[in-house]
Every structure is written in structure tokens, then in C-alpha cells.
Swiss-Prot record:
InterPro entries: Daa-tRNA_deacyls_DTD, DTD-like_sf
Domain remark in the UniProt entry: A Gly-cisPro motif from one monomer fits into the active site of the other monomer to allow specific chiral rejection of L-amino acids.
Motif (Gly-cisPro motif, important for rejection of L-amino acids): 137-138
Taxonomic lineage of the native organism: Bacteria, Pseudomonadati, Pseudomonadota, Gammaproteobacteria, Alteromonadales
Name of the protein in question: D-aminoacyl-tRNA deacylase
Originating organism: Shewanella loihica (strain ATCC BAA-1088 / PV-4)
GO terms for cellular component: cytoplasm
Enzyme class: hydrolase
The encoding gene: dtd
PANTHER family referenced in this protein's UniProt entry, alphabetically: D-AMINOACYL-TRNA DEACYLASE 1 (PTHR10472:SF5), D-TYROSYL-TRNA TYR DEACYLASE (PTHR10472)
Residue intervals passing through the bilayer: none
One biological process term in Gene Ontology: D-amino acid catabolic process
Amino acid sequence: MIALIQRVKQAKVDVDGQTIGAIDKGLLVLLGVEREDDQAKMEKLATKVMSYRIFSDEDGKMNLNLKQVGGSLLVVSQFTLAADTGRGLRPSFSGAGTPEQAKQLYQAFVDYCAAQGVPVQTGEFAADMQVSLVNDGPVTFNLQV
């Protein structure tokens, strides 16, 4: 399971010209599911995302996590993160989770984070989405479990 996380001042996702999810300070999470992913990997990644210390403390050091700064999550499904780009000029998605598996683990990730008291907004699974953000830093990390 892969999460590309970006520290943002604000982010939103639109579908068909309508904003369906938006946050201010927090993390934009682009979430990719791979074939071998399961509930245990999802929980490990969700915990890591929420606990990752990438927000600045009073000394300007990345020392605080999402909860400590009162931030929110905007979680967007992104199957292309599971692409194999090692050969040729066209990505292979053979390692990506099935749509059914990905949808289930995506929703489980969202529910798990919300159950931990983190405000969560989402995109729409498998929709054509337009994602806008103001990256803070920029600070971007690729987390994988």
C-alpha cells in the first residue's frame, strides 16, 4: 500500500465541476492499493500517515504530527501509484489491486483515520477528479508498507 502525502495549506477535489472534498491545513493523501495489500497493511499505513512528524514546531523543525497541529486529511484514490515503470515507455498496472480490493481498502483507510479523531474528506473512488492544492513547503513524502 502506498501513500503519497503532501503537507498542504489547503486542498480540494472536484468531480464534474463540483467540490466534493476540501480541507485547510493538513495532508493531501494520494492512496494506491497493491495486490498483496490487506487490512493489516492498511492500518499500519494509516497510523504512519497520521503519526508522521512533518509539521513544524516552534523552532521550525519537522517535529509535529497531523493530530498535534489540528490538521485534516483529504484522501484521494490513486491507482497509478502502484504502476511498474521499470521497463519501456508505458506503465504496467499488473501489481495494482483489483478495483474491488482497492475500493474496500480505500474506504477502510478513510474510516480508520476518522475513527482516530482526524477530520477526513475524500475524493470519489474511480471518478475523474481534479485535485487542487497549495503545497506547504513544499513537503511531500512517499510512504509504503
